[in-house]
Structures are given as structure tokens and as C-alpha cells.
A protein has these predicted regions:
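The Walker A/P-loop phosphate-binding site
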Residues: 2-110, 122-131
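Peripheral, non-AAA+ core regions of ATP-driven protein-machinery
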Residues: 21-27, 38, 242-245, 252, ...
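A short alpha->loop->secondary-structure connector
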Residues: 79-80, 104-111, 162-171, 213-218
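Phosphate-binding/switch loop-helix module in NTP-utilizing enzymes
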Residues: 117-193
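Terminal-proximal interaction/regulatory segments of ATP-powered molecular machines
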Residues: 294-336
Length: 336
């Protein structure tokens, strides 16, 4: 037995390991397809990956930017990819309904909604569940995903007590409670290989030299989440009818891909995320497609209008084209 192995055994830490054996709970062993190629690229540096399967990912934005619909779309993708999988959805806003899930193709028998009011409630229930998973033999565990929608609406036990007593004082402990919660959760979720997706609100920083958005909840989430994406939207119209939103996604923080990268996705009110939206721009940026006057020139020299590509994306984004784009995406989005 080599020296490092002896030190690991002496520590009594069953999760410790040599780097060349893989880091249990830290290394990303898989990804969850988000339903959008360009959003996958933003999160993971590949069109074909997406949300890390053992990390905390946060979608942050102002009210009505589509954070809940975005989350439900990702939940649907997770359940579709994992026929035995389940989702635990912590709802702090009473924002979701049964219809919202079923309309997005989510199997209602495989998702449970947990209404919670305070950070302490969420922490206790979530940690109890994760500890139960960790106590279960790995061969008997089912794929699981946890969603918190949203962190920004969680109160604290102190704030609830102050309101009940008629006190009008600001809760100065909230940021610390949140920080402590995710300090514990982050490591346990990694060990249990459970991905967490959460939403949060942003607000304008008063007095900033340039317009600046800040995340709600203090600094705790910034350190806990592996990935934070800020969302902003504009209406998507067809024939003067609003059919959805065009959402600009900026990488606020990431441990896997380059920060401050930006992509735009299309969120349709009826069909959810458009898998192919944004690929034309990505292909142009990568040099796979070329702009030729009013048309797009494909690698084989064919020239077509962008409108036709968007109408039949599967015809033009063949497996070979997607592979070429993905190679460029990995160079552009990943570190090193």
C-alpha cells in the first residue's frame, strides 16, 4: 500500500480518494440536458451536456423572466432521460400548479412539491432527505433532482417571529442562515450525486457607477453554487401576438466554463425551450456557417435563408454539423 493510501485509511474519511482514482462527489460524472443546445454549451462547454449532475446551479433574474418555466423544462428533460428518476420541488411562492407540470410533459407521479416558508424549514427537510439517500446503498438509489423555487422568497424563523409579534425590524441574520445552509448542503449533495437547481431574484444596486445587478440572499449563494446564470428577457412576437420570451442568459459564475459568456434562448409559452434556437448564430461565430448577403452558406456550399433553417432545424443541423459546432464550442466556452 502506498503512503497516500495509508493516510487516507488513517483519516477514516470514506469519501477521501487519490485524484487519479477520481474524486467522489466532486468530479462531474454526468450532465442533464436542458432542452437547449446553446444553454447546454453555456453551462458545460458542450452542446450535448448541460447541467452538472452533482452541483448546485442557480437561475437568477428579475420577476417574470421565466425562471419557473425554465426550471420545469429542465425537470421534464431530467425525467425523460431517467425513467426511474424523481424530482423534489421546493416551492416558496405557491407559483406552480399541477397543470404547469403536465403541460410541459412532466409525469406527475414522479414529482413531489414541498411548500416551505423559511430557510430553516427548507434546510431541515432537504438535509433529512439527502441524509436518507446517503444512508441507502448506492445500488438501490434512484436518480434524483432537487429544485428550490425560489431562494429569494424564503423567510427566516426570526423574521416570522418578528412579524407575528408586530416588530418592524430588519432581519440581519438571513444572509448568514443562507450561507450556513448551503455550506452543509453543497458537500452532501455532491456525495449523494444529487443535482440542485434553484431560482433567485436580482435587484439593481443603488448608487452603482454603472447599472449593476446583485443577487438576493447575500454572499452565501455565490460561494455555494457552482454555476449562476442571470436572465433577462424581451417578448417574442409572431404576427403581433406574444408567444413567449427571448431570454438572454449571462454566465455570472461558473467553475466549468468561462464566465461572462452570453447566449440567447427562446422560451415558448406552449412548447417550452426551443432546442435549436441560437444555433445559427453559434455556427456563424464558429465559422461553420458563413453569411452570404441575405443567405446563410452551409459547409457544403448550399445557400439558404435563415428563416428556412429555423423552420426545419433538424434538416440543416445534422449530426455531422452539430459535431463540428460542438468542437468549436468546447474551444470557445471551456477553460484551457
Amino acid at each position: 500500500m502506498d503512503f497516500l493510501k495509508e493516510m487516507i485509511n488513517a483519516s477514516g474519511n470514506k469519501y477521501a480518494s487519490k485524484v487519479d482514482d477520481g474524486l467522489d462527489g466532486a468530479d462531474v460524472s454526468g450532465y442533464i440536458d436542458t432542452g437547449s443546445y446553446v444553454f447546454n454549451a453555456l453551462l458545460s462547454g458542450s452542446l450535448f451536456d448541460g447541467l452538472p449532475n452533482n452541483k448546485i446551479t442557480c437561475l437568477a433574474g428579475e420577476s417574470a423572466t421565466g425562471k419557473t418555466y425554465f426550471s420545469i423544462g429542465i425537470v421534464a428533460q431530467f425525467l425523460a432521460a431517467n425513467p426511474e428518476g424523481v424530482v423534489l420541488y421546493f416551492d416558496t411562492e405557491q407559483a406552480v400548479t399541477s397543470d404547469m407540470f403536465t403541460e410541459r410533459g412532466v409525469d406527475p407521479k414522479r414529482i413531489a412539491v414541498f411548500p416551505v416558508e423559511t430557510v430553516e424549514e427548507f434546510r431541515h427537510q432537504c438535509l433529512t432527505i439527502v441524509d436518507k439517500v446517503l444512508a441507502t446503498d448506492e445500488s438501490e438509489r434512484k436518480p434524483m433532482m432537487i429544485v428550490l423555487d425560489s431562494l429569494g422568497m424564503l423567510s427566516t424563523a426570526k423574521e416570522m417571529n418578528d412579524v407575528a409579534e408586530g416588530k418592524n425590524t430588519r432581519d440581519m441574520t438571513r444572509a448568514q442562515v443562507i450561507k450556513g445552509t448551503f455550506r452543509v448542503l453543497t458537500l452532501k449533495l455532491g456525495k449523494a450525486k444529487i443535482p440542485m437547481l434553484m431560482t433567485n431574484h436580482t435587484y439593481d444596486v443603488v448608487g452603482a457607477y454603472v447599472p449593476t445587478k446583485e443577487l438576493g440572499g447575500g454572499s452565501g449563494l455565490k460561494y455555494a453554487a457552482s454555476t449562476i446564470v442571470t436572465l433577462s428577457k424581451k417578448k417574442d412576437k409572431q404576427d403581433d401576438e406574444v408567444v413567449g420570451n427571448l431570454i438572454t442568459c449571462k454566465l455570472y459564475k461558473s467553475r466549468l466554463t468561462k464566465e461572462n459568456k452570453i447566449v440567447q434562448v427562446q422560451l415558448n409559452f406552449d412548447s417550452g425551450l426551443n432546442r435549436y434556437y441560437g444555433l445559427v448564430d453559434l455556427a456563424l461565430d464558429c465559422g461553420i456557417f458563413k453569411k452570404n448577403s441575405t443567405k446563410i452558406e452551409l459547409p457544403d456550399g448550399t445557400k439558404v435563408f435563415e428563416k428556412h433553417i429555423n423552420e426545419e432545424p433538424q434538416k440543416y443541423f445534422t449530426d455531422e454539423i452539430l459535431k463540428q459546432i460542438d468542437e468549436k464550442v468546447q474551444e470557445e466556452f471551456k477553460y484551457g
